[in-house]
UniProtKB/Swiss-Prot annotation:
GO terms for cellular component: nucleus. Residues 338-350 have a biased composition (Low complexity). The keyword DNA-binding applies. Residues 301-363 are annotated as: Disordered. Gene3D superfamilies: Classic Zinc Finger (3.30.160.60). GO terms for molecular function: 5S rRNA binding; DNA binding; RNA polymerase III general transcription initiation factor activity; zinc ion binding. GO terms for biological process: ribosomal large subunit biogenesis. This is Transcription factor IIIA. PANTHER family: TRANSCRIPTION FACTOR IIIA, ZINC FINGER PROTEIN. It holds the Pfam family zf-C2H2. Keywords: DNA-binding, Metal-binding, Nucleus, Repeat, Ribosome biogenesis, RNA-binding, Transcription, Transcription regulation, Zinc, Zinc-finger.
Length: 363
């Protein structure tokens, strides 16, 4: 009997299992599976999980809900898992934290899986690695899924085919078939109406427009239609606000948002206003596209216009009142101290004599 191998020898061998076999030691017993305590309550579904977050992610497949929403302005994409959202946010930030450590490469990637694919294709086996093993073929492919799709030509096996009546479309992978299935099933609105969206984005758009839930600022009670707008507004109440100073020489203007600073530089310093209102008779120009979109509401009768606080027109004061220095209280109409008109003066000599006196007696 050969002596038992050390741990170092076992690790350095091809597999730990081979080392145990050579040492006449049986393989380690499998780890006991954790009990599935979290069971799906939907009818005709027997899925169960050992962790609550796994069940939550599974339930989203039934409800169509995507609870993790990107709060970047103008985005609004939603995801089932929190790490999917974290991965998506890298698109906005441009961050690529995963770097290839191969000599002379240093290529960066936003996800670990993309880095792994890069290493497999470019460094471990830069040649096409998936070869068809059917007799007389030997075609090679870079991706395993491409090989599987190709082999269907040899076996005449149907690809992943849609079973919906009247469709018959087929796909190269089950994930693509599942994604296609939503075209027939759709995304049902969960707000009590019968709307069914063909895509998740379409459902989100419907929810924003048909089921607007305004959110309120807890400080000033101002209301907003979107949470990201409220989040941006809350910065105005922060004790220490970020201030963005104009970098142009001789300009001391400051702004609380990058958007306003960019708009200032483009319109004031560079005199660039490329976005023109195309409404007939308007022709106003703007430095930023968002500013043009905000302005377009003025021309759209179907949209709610901004409720501006309009000051009531100031009453015209008589010459006598202005000369007297008398200031009438706000909200009250001042007494009529106007001078008589020319026709009255000509017809009444008494009025002509009293007119200069009126200027001196009003207090």
């Amino acid at each position: 009997m050969e002596p038992r191998v050390s741990v170092a020898e076992a690790v350095s061998s091809l597999t730990i299992a081979d080392a145990f076999v050579r040492a006449c030691v049986g393989p380690a017993p499998p780890r006991p599976a954790l009990p599935s305590r979290f069971i799906c309550s939907f009818p005709d579904c027997s899925a169960s999980y050992n962790k609550a977050w796994k069940l939550d992610a599974h339930l989203c497949k039934h409800t169509g809900e995507r609870p993790f929403v990107c709060d970047y302005e103008g985005c609004g994409k939603a995801f089932i898992r929190d790490y999917h959202l974290s991965r998506h946010i890298l698109i906005h930030t441009g961050e690529k934290p995963f770097v290839c450590a191969d000599n002379g490469c240093n290529q960066k990637f936003s996800t670990k899986s993309n880095l792994k694919k890069h290493i497999e294709r470019k460094h471990e086996n830069p040649q096409k690695q998936y070869v068809c093993n059917f007799e007389g073929c030997k075609k090679a492919f870079k991706k395993h899924q491409q090989l599987r799709t190709h082999q269907c030509q040899h076996t005449n096996e149907p690809l992943f085919r849609c079973t919906h009546e009247g469709c018959g479309k087929h796909f190269a992978s089950p994930s693509r078939l599942k994604r296609h299935g939503k075209v027939h099933e759709g995304y049902l609105c969960q707000k009590g109406c019968s709307f069914v969206g063909k895509t998740w984005t379409e459902l989100l758009k419907h929810t924003r427009e048909a089921h607007k839930e305004e959110v309120t600022c807890t400080v000033c009670q101002k209301m907003f239609k979107r949470k990201d707008h409220l989040k941006q507004h809350m910065k105005t109440h922060a004790p220490e606000r970020d201030v963005y100073r104009c970098p142009r020489e001789g300009c001391a203007r400051t702004y609380t948002t990058v958007f306003n600073l960019q708009s200032h530089i483009l319109s004031f310093h560079e005199e660039k206003r490329p976005f023109v209102c195309e409404h007939a008779g308007c022709g106003k120009t703007f430095a930023m596209k968002q500013s043009l979109m905000r302005h377009s509401v003025v021309h759209d009768p179907d949209k709610k216009r901004m409720k501006l606080k309009v000051r009531p027109p100031r009453e015209r004061r008589s010459l006598a009142s202005r000369l007297s220095g008398y200031v009438p209280p706000k909200g009250k109409q001042e007494p009529d101290c106007s001078l008589p008109n020319s026709t009255e003066s000509s017809s009444s000599p008494e009025a002509t004599m009293l007119a200069p006196a009126a200027l001196l007696t009003v207090h």
